[in-house]
Regions:
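N-terminal glutamine amidotransferase
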Residues: 1-129
């Protein structure tokens, strides 16, 4: 059976594929002091979903901690690596990148992304009150 990329059919570009293709891998943990380690293990298990880059962000109740890098999970998130020691928190989410498009600078495309919002001169921080 022909596969499509999920886009509307187009007469200009028939999108028929021979089989399944992999897409990015996402893994998260909530409520564990080892959230970053468990997330790195989960991303390692999902490495086939993206081999170009990986990133993890954690939350310790007051601050976010993130690390992103080109390459495989095992090369960047070893159990005793400085990066893992900095990823403190009980909540973590990670991403393996499988690019289908992107920037000339591949580092700019590694998730997770972060941003801040300012409105009317005030910075907004989203936390529980």
């Amino acid at each position: 059976m022909p596969m499509t990329n999920g886009a509307a059919p187009s007469n200009d570009r028939p999108e028929q594929l021979d089989g399944f293709l992999e897409e990015c891998g996402v893994f998260g943990v909530f409520g564990s002091d080892e959230a970053s380690v468990l997330t790195a293990l989960g991303l390692h298990a999902l490495q086939h979903r993206g081999q170009e880059a990986s990133g993890i962000v954690t939350f310790d109740g007051s601050d976010f901690h993130a690390h992103r890098a080109l390459g495989h999970v095992g090369d960047n998130f070893g159990a005793n690596s400085p990066q893992m020691r900095e990823l403190r928190g009980h909540i973590a989410i990670g991403h393996n990148r499988y690019s289908t498009s992107g920037n000339v600078n591949p580092f700019m495309e590694i998730q997770p992304f972060s941003s801040e919002l300012a409105f009317g001169g005030s910075r907004w921080r989203i936390t529980a009150i």
